[in-house]
Amino acid sequence: MKTLIDYLRFRFTASPFQALEVVRSALGFVTPDLVDLGGSEKGKDGWQYRRPIILGGDEILGYVDYGGESQRGWSRWDMSGAGCSWIYRWDLLAQFLPSIGGELRRVDVALDFFGGEVSHDDVLSAYHRGLFKKPHVGRSPKLKKVETSCPTDGRTIYIGARTSSRFIRCYEKGWELLAKAKVPEGFKTASSGFYFRRNTPSSPADYYRLEVELKAVDGFFIPLDILTNPDSFFSGAAPYFESLVESAPSRLVQPPSDFLQVQTLQSSMEHCSRAYGGLLRSLLELYGDTVETKARLFDALCSQNPSDRLVKAGCLSLPVGAENAR
């Protein structure tokens, strides 16, 4: 397999906890019981209730929505890319979804390049050569470019309509991840590489992602086969994608990278140092630079509750002493 599933939405008629058991059966790299449903919250999009899908008691992987007369007995499971990265047995998920009345409603399939094999300009060139047109269609789908004057902000291309059954995104994933982790601007280009994958550093400028979002709208049906053979569905999204899948290397099956958690934590510490480092140094000059003084100041300034942002990012699940994302 060369592509990966980066978003999963399905509806179902069983209880949310039955759906949880089905998803647990497909998990890998983690003890299934560590993935659970959080407390009930007010629902969205017409559902009466919702519960977060939580890993290790803190990291949110998605949401399950349920209840409400207008939903006619349906519930909805929404799992982000972070959640999908923990699924190992997609074949079991495809096998057991029918047992809970499950139907796929949205599946995003992505192809990553980490070594600069594909660039933003390559995608633009392919579009202008008509390589995103469907067969027997005269015009290419609409293209939208999103970019700023700052190269490290990253560039994005949208192809097609957001509400249609097929919507394509092509973007500089490395820069996007650094922005999400709030990496200080000076650090983005100073580093020799970031561990977007475990054990393998890559330049953020070389990490590019191409992604197709398939939705069950306008009469389009998403078969369960997409869970076990995403490469073929990605290839069918555009002639350009077909050529990329043919030349791309097979994807290594490995645990998700903890890059975002490590980098988010390091960035938060850097921001804290810049904002409050001067205050802390002044207090040490005033009260004495000793271990005892530092301990008292830490206790005095430390909040009773951890940062909500770091909790939701899964930073509290990192091993003690983690310094680099691997």
Q: Which residues fall in each region the model found?
A:
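Structured, helix-rich domain cores that form ligand/interaction pockets
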Residues: 1-263, 268-326
